[in-house]
Amino acid sequence: VPPTEEPVEEPEWVEPPISADGRWIDVDLTNQMVYAYEDDTLVASFLVSTGTWMTPTVTGQYHIYVKYRSAPMSGPGYYLPDVPYIMYFYKGYGLHGTYWHSNFGTPMSHGCVNLRTDEAAWLFEWASVGTLVNVHY
């Protein structure tokens, strides 16, 4: 392609959308809540349990990088078979269903975001690999 005779202005940079479909997840550690958004519209909210002070949930902006309908989870001092609806967003941190407790609203996890299984199922079907996960206090 031959060069133009006159310089062309640099195109204006536009921030990319949160995801192709505008969906994103907000994890509020202070209030132990997860919010599902489509652009600026809240479409669902869930009471959750996140990490304890000894095993805190990471903060920052991440993207779901893999989803498992069911898989085992383990770490120092625990093994949990068949954990439902896992969506990992950073290393071993994820959102998932929880069958071993129902104490939602209280930090109890090893760093993951624990949801009721039926609510985790909804979020799992709604979100995609690549969906933004914003985690904050």
Language model regions located:
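Extracytoplasmic intrinsically disordered, low-complexity "stalk/linker" and propeptide segments
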Residues: 1-5
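Exported/periplasmic cell-wall-interacting domains
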Residues: 7-22, 42, 52-61, 66-137
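Short glycine-aspartate micro-motif
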Residues: 24-26
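Gly/Thr-rich phosphate-binding beta-strand-loop-beta motif of the actin/hexokinase/Hsp70
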Residues: 28, 34
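Residue-level detector of high-confidence beta-strand sites
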Residues: 45-47
